[in-house]
């Protein structure tokens, strides 16, 4: 954990789309790509303090959470999980809350706090933040206004410039930013869902989307199109003075499969 000079080190993984058996998604071997990412994470030195898994952890099969545990627990660090539109929050809350798998939504450290928001909305790929989620955020920021803050969710809270993806943002994203913009120590918001990397800014708040561990989408295409980039993940270093460093790693090789 951070000291005066050592940062809090976090890994974000997202959009695993794991099934109960090895599978493909848009021609990508989901298991092989995830294993490549996890092997890369295990090789990091220094190791992360914990991992944030920001949704679409399984591909519409609630039984796959057992496999997810088996793959993530060997990492040896806590894994905090959020649901996406392909997940089952009630099942997640039962299966992913023991051992290294965690279900806490508000994490407080010496100089930083993380707030994990559930943006899933049953039956649709669109995101929505329920009143309880906005209240969780507002309370955390009001109670700890002195802490630097990183907010995590699954869906994009605002358009990212990709026509088809921008139909699936958080529909009440402005309500989110109305809260965030009242607190000057909110440093960044990070999400997944778009299967691509994104970096932006809204006022003083940094914005990051993280590539999937599975298939990658071309953010410049007007309709869904697979990108040939390898799977990826994001790392964060959060320093006591509020400095935030981040980057994306894409383990080689790419794992796109050619259909027989």
Walk through the language-model features, giving the residues of each.
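N-terminal active-site segment of His-dependent metallophosphoesterases
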Residues: 1-69, 160
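Binuclear metal-dependent phosphoesterase catalytic core
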Residues: 4, 28-31, 35, 179, ...
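Active-site-proximal beta-strand elements of phosphoester/diester hydrolases
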Residues: 7-20, 111-120, 150-152, 205-211, ...
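Active-site metal-binding loops of divalent metal-dependent hydrolases
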Residues: 14-17, 55-57, 85-86, 119-120, ...
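Acidic/histidine-rich helix-loop elements
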Residues: 14-33, 59, 88-101, 122-131, ...
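Metal-dependent catalytic neighborhoods of phosphoester/phosphodiester hydrolases
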Residues: 23-24, 53-73, 88-101, 127, ...
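His/acidic metal-ligating clusters that form di-metal
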Residues: 37-50, 126-208, 242-244
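A short, structured active-site edge motif that brings together acidic residues
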Residues: 79-90
